[in-house]
C-alpha cells in the first residue's frame, strides 16, 4: 500500500504543481502553480481564494480557466441555474434572460474539442476517490484546482455554479494511481489526523499570525514533525487553517476578556453613589484609581470608553424616565380635562384659574413634570374636540329642527288639501275667511313661529295650484260658451248658464276633468269682468263730464265783466251760452252744476277775505282806545309777580266769537240757496278742483 500524499518524502519544497489531466494526447508536464484556489462555503457555494493577496471572488479567475472556459467567458451570454436547478441564460450587455440556450452559446459548445472532453472525463474518474472539500472546511478556506464532474450533456459540464468542484491535489513524479490507496499509514490514517498533528507542531513552536509561510518554512523545515504532512501544498493549506483558527481563538478570547472587564467595570460604577450622567472622567479616575476592576483594563482609552458607554446609558435612562413621566403627567392632565366641565370656547386664562383651584391638579405630583407648553397644547386639543362635538351637536339639532319643521309644513299642506276637498278653499277664498276655520287646529299652531314658509305662504301656494288648474281647463268651458253662443254680463242668469254648460260638456271626452265648481268659477269671472268693464265705462263718462264742467267753470271765471257772487244762473245764461264749453255740455244739469260750483268758490273766497279783515281789525291799535289805555300802563297787566287780565280782552274775544258764528250761518244759508237738487249727485259726490281732481 502506498503512503498518503501528505507523507510523501520525494518532493522538494520549491517544486510547483502538475496537472492531473490525462488523455490520449495529454502528456504529463510540470507547470507553475496558480495563487488562486477553489473553495466551497458551508452551503456548498464555490468561490475562489488567492493565497497571496488573500482576496476572494465568486467568478472563476482567468488563471484557472482552460482555453474553452476562456472562450465562454468572452461571450455576452452567461449560464445560470435557478433554486430548483433549472438552467437559464443571461446577456450581460442587453440584460435579457431566456430559458432556451442561445445560438451563440450553442455554437461555442459544439466547437468544444473532443480531446478536451475526454480529458475532462478521465480527470473526473481520477478524482472520484479524493477527499471531499468539507474535510478541511472547519479550519479555513478550502483551496482546490478547477475540475468538472460528469454530466449528461455538454452544457451541463461547463454550467457556472451548477457542477461540483473537487480538490485537485498535486501528484508526485511517481504518478500514484489513486489517492484512496495513499490514505493508509502506520501513524495517520486520515488527512484530518495528519492535519491535527501539524497544528500541534506549529503551536509547539509558537507560530502566530505575524508569521508568513515563507518564514515558517525557513524556521521549521529542519524541525521534527514538520514533515508529518509530506505534500508541501497540504502543509500550506494546513498552515492557513492554523492561522485562521489562531485568529478566531484570539478574537474569542479578546471578546470574553472585554465582556468580563465591561461587566466588572459597570458593576464598579453602579456601586458608587457619586457617578451620575453629568460626572466627568477625572472624577471617576480619582475615585476608582485603586479599584481592581478599574485597573483590570488594558489602557486608559479602554477605561474611558467603558465609562462613556455607562454614562451614555445613564443619559438614555434619564431621558426615557423623563419621557415616561411627561407621558404619565400628560395622560393625567388629559383625564382631568375630560372630567372638568369646560365650554367649547373657554379661554386658557379661565382654565388656568380653575386648575389652580382644583385639588386633582394641585395634589398630583406628576404635574410638576408637565411643561406649560404641553399643557397648553393638550388644552387646545381638548377645546378643539369640544368645538367639534358642539358643532356636530348643533348640526344634529338643526337637522332635527328642519325635519320637524318639514313635517309641520307637510301636515299643514294636508290640512289645506282636506279643506280644498271639502270646498272650503276655492279660488275666491280669502285668508280672512279661512283663518277662523284653522286658528285652533294643532297643525296650524305647530307651524307658527318656525322658519321657512308661513301658513299664509302655503295658503297662497294652494290658491296658485287652483289657479293653474283653472287656467288649464277654462278653455274647454269657453269653447262651450262659444258653441252655445252664450254671452255673460251683469244681468245674465248664472245658474241657468252653468246647467247648460254642464249638459254640453258631458258629451265631450275632456269633460271628466271639468267639475261644476270650475264651470261656476269661469262663469262668475266672466260676469265680474263684464261688471268691471261697465263700471270702468261709467267712471270714464263721469271723468269726461267733470272735465267739461271744470272747463265751463273756468270759462265763466274769465268772463268780462266778472260775474258777481249774487248773480243767478238765469241771469248769466245768455252770456255763457255762446261759449264752446257751454255747448260741449249737452245736459242743462251739468251746465248749472258748473255755474253753482263757480258761485260757491267765489263766495268761499269772499268769506276768507272777511275773516282776514277781522283778524287785522283785532290787532288795529289806532281804533281801540282801551288798548291804548292799557298799553300806557306800565308792565301792561303784570304787577307784583302775577298776571292780570283786562275786562276788554274778554269782551273782544266774545265779539269775535259772535262775528264768527254769524259768518258761518250766512255761508250755510248761501250754500243752501245756491245748490240745486237736479245736480246734487254730481256736485256733492264728485266735486272737482280747477285741475279736474276729485276731492
From Swiss-Prot:
GO terms for molecular function: RNA binding; RNA polymerase II CTD heptapeptide repeat kinase activity. Signal peptide: none annotated. GO terms for biological process: mRNA 5'-splice site recognition; mRNA splicing, via spliceosome. InterPro entries: FF_domain (IPR002713), FF_domain_sf (IPR036517), Prp40-like (IPR039726), WW_dom (IPR001202), WW_dom_sf (IPR036020). It comes from the Eukaryota. Residues 146-161 have a biased composition (Polar residues). Pfam families: FF, WW. Keywords: mRNA processing, mRNA splicing, Nucleus, Phosphoprotein, Repeat, Ribonucleoprotein. Residues 30-63, 71-104 form the WW domain. Disulfide bonds: none annotated. Transmembrane segments: none annotated. The modification Phosphoserine is found at residues 688-689. It is found in: Nucleus. PROSITE patterns: FF, WW_DOMAIN_2. One of its GO terms (cellular component) is U2-type prespliceosome. Residues 1-35, 120-165 are annotated as: Disordered. Residues 191-245, 257-313, 326-385, 403-465, 470-521, 544-601 form the FF domain. Required for pre-spliceosome formation, which is the first step of pre-mRNA splicing. This protein is associated with snRNP U1. This is Pre-mRNA-processing protein prp40.
Amino acid at each position: 500500500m502506498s503512503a498518503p500524499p501528505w507523507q510523501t518524502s520525494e518532493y522538494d519544497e520549491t517544486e510547483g504543481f502538475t496537472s492531473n489531466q490525462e488523455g490520449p494526447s495529454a502528456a504529463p508536464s510540470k507547470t507553475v502553480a496558480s495563487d488562486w484556489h477553489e473553495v466551497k462555503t458551508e452551503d456548498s457555494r464555490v468561490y475562489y481564494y488567492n493565497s497571496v493577496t488573500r482576496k476572494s471572488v465568486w467568478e472563476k479567475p482567468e488563471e484557472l480557466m482552460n482555453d474553452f472556459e476562456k472562450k465562454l467567458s468572452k461571450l455576452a451570454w452567461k449560464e445560470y441555474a435557478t433554486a430548483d436547478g433549472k438552467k437559464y441564460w443571461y446577456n450581460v450587455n442587453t440584460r435579457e434572460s431566456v430559458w432556451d440556450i442561445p445560438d451563440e452559446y450553442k455554437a461555442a459548445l459544439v466547437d468544444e474539442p473532443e480531446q478536451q472532453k475526454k480529458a475532462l472525463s478521465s480527470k473526473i474518474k481520477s478524482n472520484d476517490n479524493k477527499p471531499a472539500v468539507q474535510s478541511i472546511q472547519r479550519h479555513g478556506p478550502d483551496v482546490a484546482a478547477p475540475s468538472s464532474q460528469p454530466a449528461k450533456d455538454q452544457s451541463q459540464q461547463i454550467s457556472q455554479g451548477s457542477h461540483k468542484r473537487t480538490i485537485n491535489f498535486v501528484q508526485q513524479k511517481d504518478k500514484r494511481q489513486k489517492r484512496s490507496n495513499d490514505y493508509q499509514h502506520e501513524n495517520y490514517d486520515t488527512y484530518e489526523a495528519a492535519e491535527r498533528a501539524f497544528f500541534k507542531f506549529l503551536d509547539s513552536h509558537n507560530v502566530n499570525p505575524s508569521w508568513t509561510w515563507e518564514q515558517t518554512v525557513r524556521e521549521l523545515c529542519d524541525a521534527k514533525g514538520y514533515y508529518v504532512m509530506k505534500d508541501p501544498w497540504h502543509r500550506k493549506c494546513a498552515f492557513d487553517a492554523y492561522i485562521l483558527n489562531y485568529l478566531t481563538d484570539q478574537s474569542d478570547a479578546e471578546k470574553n476578556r472585554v465582556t468580563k472587564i465591561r461587566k466588572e467595570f459597570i458593576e464598579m460604577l453602579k456601586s458608587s453613589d457619586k457617578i451620575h450622567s453629568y460626572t466627568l472622567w477625572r472624577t471617576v479616575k480619582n475615585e476608582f484609581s485603586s479599584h481592581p476592576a478599574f485597573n483590570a483594563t488594558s489602557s486608559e482609552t479602554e477605561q474611558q470608553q467603558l465609562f462613556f458607554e455607562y454614562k451614555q446609558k445613564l443619559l438614555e435612562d434619564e431621558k426615557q424616565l423623563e419621557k415616561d413621566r411627561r407621558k404619565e403627567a400628560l395622560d393625567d392632565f388629559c383625564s382631568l380635562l375630560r372630567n372638568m366641565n369646560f365650554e367649547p370656547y373657554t379661554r386658557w386664562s379661565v382654565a388656568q384659574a380653575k386648575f389652580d383651584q382644583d385639588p386633582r391638579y394641585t395634589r398630583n405630583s406628576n404635574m410638576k413634570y408637565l411643561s406649560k407648553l404641553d399643557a397648553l397644547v393638550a388644552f387646545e386639543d381638548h377645546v378643539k374636540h369640544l368645538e367639534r362635538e358642539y358643532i356636530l351637536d348643533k348640526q344634529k339639532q338643526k337637522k332635527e329642527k328642519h325635519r320637524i319643521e318639514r313635517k309641520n309644513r307637510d301636515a299643514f299642506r294636508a290640512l289645506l288639501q282636506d279643506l280644498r276637498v271639502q270646498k272650503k278653499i276655492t279660488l275666491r277664498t280669502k285668508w280672512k275667511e279661512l283663518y277662523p276655520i284653522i286658528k285652533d287646529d294643532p297643525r296650524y299652531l305647530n307651524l307658527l313661529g318656525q322658519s321657512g314658509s308661513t301658513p299664509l305662504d302655503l295658503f297662497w301656494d294652494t290658491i296658485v295650484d287652483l289657479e293653474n288648474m283653472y287656467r288649464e281647463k277654462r278653455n274647454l268651458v269657453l269653447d262651450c260658451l262659444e258653441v252655445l253662443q252664450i254671452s255673460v254680463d251683469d244681468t245674465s242668469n248664472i245658474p241657468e248658464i252653468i246647467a247648460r254648460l254642464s249638459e254640453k260638456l258631458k258629451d265631450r271626452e275632456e269633460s271628466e276633468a271639468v267639475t261644476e265648481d270650475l264651470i261656476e268659477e269661469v262663469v262668475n269671472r266672466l260676469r265680474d269682468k263684464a261688471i268691471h268693464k261697465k263700471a270702468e265705462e261709467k267712471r270714464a263718462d263721469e271723468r269726461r263730464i267733470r272735465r267739461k264742467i271744470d272747463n265751463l267753470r273756468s270759462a265763466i271765471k274769465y268772463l268780462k265783466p266778472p260775474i258777481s257772487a249774487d248773480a243767478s244762473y238765469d241771469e248769466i245764461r245768455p252770456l255763457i251760452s255762446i261759449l264752446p264749453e257751454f255747448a260741449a255740455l249737452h245736459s242743462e244739469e251739468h251746465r248749472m252744476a258748473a255755474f253753482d260750483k263757480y258761485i260757491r268758490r267765489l263766495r268761499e273766497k269772499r268769506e276768507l277775505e272777511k275773516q282776514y279783515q277781522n283778524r287785522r281789525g283785532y290787532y288795529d291799535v289806532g281804533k281801540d282806545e282801551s288798548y291804548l289805555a292799557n298799553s300806557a300802563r306800565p308792565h301792561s297787566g303784570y304787577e307784583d309777580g302775577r298776571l292780570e287780565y283786562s275786562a276788554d280782552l274778554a269782551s273782544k274775544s266774545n265779539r269775535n266769537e259772535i262775528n264768527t258764528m254769524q259768518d258761518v250761518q250766512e255761508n250755510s244759508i248761501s250754500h243752501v240757496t245756491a245748490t240745486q237738487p237736479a245736480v246734487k249727485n254730481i256736485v256733492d259726490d264728485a266735486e272737482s278742483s280747477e285741475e279736474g281732481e276729485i276731492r
